[in-house]
Amino acid sequence: MPSPIALLTAATERIERVDAEALLLHALDCDRAWLFTHGDIPLAAAATESFQALVEQRARGIPVAYLIGRRGFWTLDVMVSSATLIPRAETETLVEQALQRLDHASERRVADLGTGSGAIALAIACERPQAQVLATDNSAAALDIAARNASAHGLNHVVFREGDWYEALLGERFDLIVSNPPYIAVTDPHLTQGDLRFEPPSALISGGDGLDALRILTAGAPAYLRPGGWLVMEHGWDQGAAMRTLLHTAGLVAVATVQDLEARDRVTVGRCPGF
């Protein structure tokens, strides 16, 4: 029977080492410390076959997050499935900007539109436990994953509703509306590359220029924000200028675009006047 290190070495001929390690840890249900202190022991046939099957799937392009069923985001280990977008590091910029505009007052109300796995809503709820957080999505399958994530992290006060964008808010108003909506143009060649090939198109594609969902969300925001409330939106690296125009057109003030850690436009914010 091969050892963990032998399996890992063989796998790196087909896939990236970081991916191979993640898959091996998953197949063995162990941590890195165990792996590298027991790296030379023979493995059972079942564990070997499980790992090799995962490597085969990864070699075909299936994202590691879908193969192991989870992804780290913020301080959370988030369950994901093919019904949800895979949380990405750049989206932590969105969470940071939301938290900067959300104090610890218990009456603060937050809506995360298009929550997917719930990563954004749960990160905010974790950092602002007094806030009333509502997370919405038009996918029942995604909401099921999000609710399971909330339960796993003891964030059972987060409320989930099914609905398309603002229809799920039922006319309520919020101190902060946050969203990472689809913002990729239907003709974007990146859709045929990498992990994007396997993620739900409805969570990625938004019309001919990628702005359809962003237009809906910015135009509708004033009707659902309290005076002084903030809209915080993630978007593509080349959409910052368009987003600022959309927020200004919607009547929001203090409009600004924030860059991610790679110095790319990633989040645009605006405040509802009247406060």
UniProtKB/Swiss-Prot annotation:
GO terms for biological process: methylation. It is an enzyme of class 2 (transferase). The keyword Membrane does not apply. It catalyses: L-glutaminyl-[peptide chain release factor] + S-adenosyl-L-methionine = N(5)-methyl-L-glutaminyl-[peptide chain release factor] + S-adenosyl-L-homocysteine + H(+). It holds the Pfam family MTS. Its EC number is 2.1.1.297. It comes from the Bacteria. The keyword Methyltransferase applies. Belongs to the protein N5-glutamine methyltransferase family. PrmC subfamily. This is Release factor glutamine methyltransferase.
